[in-house]
C-alpha cells in the first residue's frame, strides 16, 4: 500500500512538472505570435495615438509605399543612440499597422569614401532645404570628441506616376564650429522624444495629402454671386 502511494505521488509530481513546462512553452509560442507591449509612462510616449492608428490603417490615406531614410546610424553618443532606437520603435509600430505601405532604413552617412560622403551630405542638405547637420561635443574615455550627425529623415512617396519628397528634422541643426555639448542636448532630446510621433505622422499626412481640384467662378455675366457659390467654394 505504501509503495502504491509513493508511486502515485511520483506520477503526480511528474505530471505536474510536465504541465508547467508545457504551459511555459505554450506561452512563449503565443508571445512570439502576438506583438504587444505595456506603456507605463505618464505621457504614453510608447503608445500610438488613436488618430495615428486610424490614419495608418486606412489604405485610401496611403495608397502606395512611403520610403523613409533615416540618417542616424554609426558611432553615436549613447544619448543619440537611444533617440535613434526610439525612432526605430515608433516606425516599427507604424509599419505594424500600415504594413508594406511603409518602408524605412537607417543609413550611416559616414560610410564610403570622402567623395561619396560629401556627395551624400550635399543630397541630404539640399542647399539648406533638406536636413540640417548637428555638431555635438562630448567626453569619452577622458577625451573630448566632436561628431557631426544628420538628425533627420528623407521621405519619398509615388502616386499616379508623380514622386513627392519631403524631409523631417528631428533635432535642430547647428552653425559650423558651434557644437552643442551633450549637457545642452538633454532637454532638446527629451522634447524630440515627446514630439516624435506627431512629427512623423504630420510629415506622412502632408506627403500623402491629395491635391484639391480648384474651381474657378466667373462674375459679371449673370453667374451665381459670391453668397450663392459659398458652399461650392468650401468643398
What are these regions (language model features)?
Residues 2-235:
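Short, surface-exposed patches at the edges or C-terminal ends of soluble domains, predominantly
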Amino acid at each position: 500500500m505504501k509503495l502504491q502511494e509513493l508511486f502515485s505521488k511520483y506520477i503526480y509530481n511528474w505530471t505536474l512538472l510536465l504541465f508547467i513546462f508545457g504551459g511555459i512553452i505554450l506561452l512563449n509560442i503565443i508571445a512570439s505570435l502576438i506583438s504587444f507591449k505595456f506603456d507605463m509612462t505618464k505621457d504614453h510616449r510608447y503608445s500610438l495615438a488613436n488618430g495615428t492608428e486610424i490614419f495608418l490603417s486606412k489604405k485610401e490615406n496611403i495608397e502606395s509605399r512611403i520610403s523613409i531614410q533615416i540618417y542616424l546610424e554609426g558611432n553615436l553618443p549613447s544619448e543619440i543612440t537611444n533617440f535613434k532606437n526610439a525612432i526605430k520603435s515608433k516606425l516599427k509600430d507604424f509599419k505594424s499597422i500600415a504594413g508594406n505601405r511603409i518602408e524605412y532604413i537607417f543609413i550611416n552617412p559616414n560610410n564610403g569614401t570622402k567623395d561619396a560622403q560629401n556627395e551624400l551630405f550635399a543630397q541630404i542638405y539640399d542647399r539648406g532645404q533638406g536636413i540640417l547637420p548637428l555638431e555635438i561635443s562630448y567626453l569619452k574615455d577622458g577625451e573630448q570628441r566632436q561628431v557631426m550627425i544628420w538628425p533627420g529623415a528623407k521621405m519619398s512617396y509615388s502616386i499616379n506616376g508623380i514622386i513627392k519628397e519631403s524631409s523631417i528634422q528631428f533635432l535642430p541643426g547647428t552653425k559650423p564650429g558651434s557644437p552643442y555639448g551633450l549637457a545642452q542636448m538633454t532637454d532638446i532630446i527629451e522634447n524630440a522624444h515627446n514630439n516624435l510621433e506627431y512629427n512623423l505622422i504630420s510629415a506622412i499626412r502632408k506627403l500623402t495629402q491629395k491635391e484639391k481640384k480648384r474651381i474657378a467662378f466667373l462674375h459679371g455675366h449673370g453667374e451665381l454671386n459670391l453668397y450663392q457659390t459659398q458652399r461650392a467654394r468650401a468643398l
